[in-house]
């Protein structure tokens, strides 16, 4: 019996974040690919209007707040850093958590970090 797409989607949908992370790493190793986002160049010659509109944003952690452990968990999930690296990033605030991300991704990460108690800026 063949596995349908729906069966796969249900199985993936029931995984935890850590299990999904392991699954992505297994795909990367097995197929020799990377899950990193590919930057797509915008149309050339847009002129001054394009110069005014920012397309890449940096999410800056300016403070960990009272719930430092929760902030470290969000940083680890968003960046794929190890525990020590994520803790060092949070302890060394202000620091960039992610650079060169879209506005939607930056706002989503900002919301997650703020929900965990961090102080965040999007530049």
Curated annotation (Swiss-Prot):
Pfam families: Ribosomal_L12, Ribosomal_L12_N. GO terms for molecular function: mRNA binding; structural constituent of ribosome. Belongs to the bacterial ribosomal protein bL12 family. It comes from the Bacteria. SUPFAM superfamilies: ClpS-like, Ribosomal protein L7/12, oligomerisation (N-terminal) domain. Homodimer. Part of the ribosomal stalk of the 50S ribosomal subunit. Forms a multimeric L10(L12)X complex, where L10 forms an elongated spine to which 2 to 4 L12 dimers bind in a sequential fashion. Binds GTP-bound translation factors. The gene is rplL. It comes from Dechloromonas aromatica (strain RCB). One of its GO terms (cellular component) is cytosolic large ribosomal subunit. GO terms for biological process: translation. This is Large ribosomal subunit protein bL12.
């Amino acid at each position: 019996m063949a596995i349908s797409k729906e069966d796969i989607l249900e199985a993936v949908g029931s995984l935890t974040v850590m299990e999904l992370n392991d699954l992505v790493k297994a795909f990367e190793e097995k197929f020799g690919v990377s899950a990193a986002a590919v930057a797509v160049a915008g149309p050339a010659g847009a002129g001054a209007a394009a110069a005014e509109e920012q397309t890449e944003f940096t999410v800056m952690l300016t403070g960990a707040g009272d719930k430092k452990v929760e902030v470290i968990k969000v940083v680890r999930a968003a960046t794929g850093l190890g525990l020590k690296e994520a803790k060092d990033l949070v302890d060394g605030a202000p620091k960039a958590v992610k650079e060169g991300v879209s506005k939607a991704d930056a706002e989503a990460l900002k919301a997650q970090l703020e929900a965990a108690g961090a102080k965040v800026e999007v530049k």
